[in-house]
């Protein structure tokens, strides 16, 4: 069986990673998300944007994969599994999943905003949240930015291409913890359905996908995913 997993913020929220809408420590609560996650916000105040992302980087480093992440990784022993994620954390990888296609980038990868060269140098230490942090500087003189897809930016070509390939070849797509409103990622479930794959939605809340999904499970990832692989044949018949 070939399984494509599309994961969103809900699965990581169970590990203590705030969702994007909640991911603002008191220092940044007064800022609109656009100010912290856009090229315009970066141009206006790169120190503030860097401070916010560096705080998120260290926050995620301190949490652990949950039962949902571990279940998906365990499926690899019984099926061909590809993970497509809208999340910018590394919890799928730490649980053991391979491959993982990050559609929106990663909090653990950085690049020069000017020349795009990847940055693997030291990061500023952060014992506690700081409103503004000076970004590292590339050899070309450009500032180092998080390798994250900001508002208005295109998805990275290679992860998107591989996500589409995994979706097109899947027998089953499991959509977990995503609102199903952020495109183009939300269109992957529609693509899977159009190609005859079963789409299983795992989400405590009703989403725009719920009406068309083959099966909707109103549970969290850590509740539904352990044991789901063994239950799939009966659930889908």
UniProtKB/Swiss-Prot annotation:
Cofactor or coenzyme needed: Zn(2+)
GO CC annotation terms, alphabetical: cytoplasm
Keywords: Cytoplasm, Metal-binding, NAD, Transferase, Zinc
GO molecular function terms attached to this record: histone deacetylase activity, NAD-dependent; NAD+ binding; protein-malonyllysine demalonylase activity; protein-succinyllysine desuccinylase activity; zinc ion binding
Enzyme class: transferase
List of residues binding NAD(+): 8-28, 86-89, 177-179, 203-205, 221
Enzyme Commission number(s) from the entry: 2.3.1.286
Compartment list: Cytoplasm
Catalyzed reactions per annotation: N(6)-acetyl-L-lysyl-[protein] + NAD(+) + H2O = 2''-O-acetyl-ADP-D-ribose + nicotinamide + L-lysyl-[protein]; N(6)-succinyl-L-lysyl-[protein] + NAD(+) + H2O = 2''-O-succinyl-ADP-D-ribose + nicotinamide + L-lysyl-[protein]
Deacetylase sirtuin-type domain location: 1-235
Co-factor binding comment: Binds 1 zinc ion per subunit.
Chief location category: cytoplasm
Protein family membership: Belongs to the sirtuin family. Class III subfamily.
HAMAP family hit by this protein: Sirtuin_ClassIII
UniProt free text on domains: 2 residues (Tyr-53 and Arg-56) present in a large hydrophobic pocket are probably involved in substrate specificity. They are important for desuccinylation activity, but dispensable for deacetylation activity.
Entry function: NAD-dependent lysine deacetylase and desuccinylase that specifically removes acetyl and succinyl groups on target proteins. Modulates the activities of several proteins which are inactive in their acylated form.
Protein name: NAD-dependent protein deacylase
Organism: Mycolicibacterium paratuberculosis (strain ATCC BAA-968 / K-10) (Mycobacterium paratuberculosis)
């Amino acid at each position: 069986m070939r399984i494509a997993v599309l994961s969103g913020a809900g699965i990581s929220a169970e590990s203590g990673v705030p969702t994007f809408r909640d991911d603002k420590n008191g220092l940044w609560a007064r800022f609109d998300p656009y100010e912290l996650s856009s090229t315009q916000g970066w141009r206006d105040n790169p120190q503030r944007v860097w401070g916010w992302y560096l705080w998120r980087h260290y926050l995620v480093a301190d949490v652990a994969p949950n039962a949902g992440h571990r279940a998906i990784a365990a499926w690899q022993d019984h099926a061909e599994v590809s993970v497509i994620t809208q999340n910018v954390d590394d919890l799928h990888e730490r649980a053991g999943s391979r491959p993982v296609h990050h559609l929106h980038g990663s909090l653990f990868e950085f690049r020069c905003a000017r020349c795009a060269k990847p940055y693997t140098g030291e990061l500023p230490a952060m014992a506690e949240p700081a409103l503004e942090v000076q970004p590292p500087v590339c050899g070309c003189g450009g500032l180092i930015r998080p390798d994250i897809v900001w508002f208005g930016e295109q998805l990275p070509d290679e992860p998107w291409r591989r996500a589409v390939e995994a979706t097109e070849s899947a027998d089953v797509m499991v959509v977990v913890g995503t609102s199903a409103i952020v495109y183009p990622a939300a269109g992957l479930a529609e693509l899977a359905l159009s190609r005859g794959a079963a789409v299983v939605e795992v989400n405590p809340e009703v989403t725009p996908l719920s009406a068309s999904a083959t099966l909707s499970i109103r549970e969290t990832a850590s509740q539904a995913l352990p044991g789901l692989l063994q239950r799939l044949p009966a659930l889908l018949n």
